[in-house]
Amino acid sequence: MKIKQLLLSFMLFGYAAFSFSSETDSTAYPSFKFDGTLKNKFEYVPEAGTSRFSVRNSRLGVSGKIFPMVDYRAQVELSSEGKFQVLDLSGSIKPYEGLSFTLGQTSIPIYNSYTTNPGTMMFANRTFLAKYYGGTRDIGFLTKYDFDALQIPMSAEFGIFNSNVINSPTWRDKLSYAARISFGDMKGFRSTFKVYDYPNSPEIHHFMYGADLRYEGKNWKVETEAMKRDDKVNNDKDLFAYYLQGAYSFKLKENYLFKNIMPAVRYDFIDQIADNKIDVSRLTFGLGFGLGKKAFSSLLRIDYEWYFKNNQLDFLNQYEEMDADKLTVELVYIF
């Protein structure tokens, strides 16, 4: 079954590439833009004396326009820890400048793409917030409006979804909803405020809300975010997570293999138990070696994580290496 899925993916992308190459200058539509991410890594846990190699992500995507105001997006994951997944399958209509309506499987407007997208993450491993709060995609309807207010770029998003996992369109008596408002853009200051109601089943109902702030300069960036997840079924399983991270890119000579070097540092924590101690926190140091002129793109990365535990969390203790100090060497290609 996986082989068939893989072959189908290559056939679809091959057909799109052939169609694109066959266009003439007078044919503007349909248009195609391809993107991809490949992440291979090695991990070593000194305390346990164990190590592993893995292909963490292998993504291929295509997006473009069918007509002047009609967009599409498709993306597949060839290997997410060995699993094939369809990630994005959506169409968008843009009847007015800045306004879009999207239907299909797409991202939920609650997480920041720079903490969930393998191609834009600052470290090999995601923040606690991005990894353990819930899925990042669902099937549904999303509307977004980009506008300027007082010369500040802003956007407002609202979506309703199946309140389920991706690639599983089930009948529901309750749908989930998410809303987000953003101030600024990815260069300079940017801040967002968001809420997400997720009534998955009688046993699982989460309500999330949070805010973030980031600043990106020419060759550096700093990001911070806090989010609460209320458990509407079990009050003793509420979660609160936070992170603060930053990186700086130093240019090297163009004739070097590595075009820049990027030190990075992150502190994050996640807390569930209602006491005066943080359950699990982590300090991560990273050093990236850029393969291209563009900072924070394709690179060879070396990270080391230190974990500090006051209470065991079940979802962070599924195997010994999960919450143990860890060395990671990762090769990331972004195209």
Regions found by a protein language model. Give the residues of each.
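Sequence/structural signature of outer-membrane beta-barrel proteins
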Residues: 41-47, 69, 77-81, 110, ...
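A generic beta-sheet turn/junction motif
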Residues: 147-151, 215-219, 250, 291-295, ...
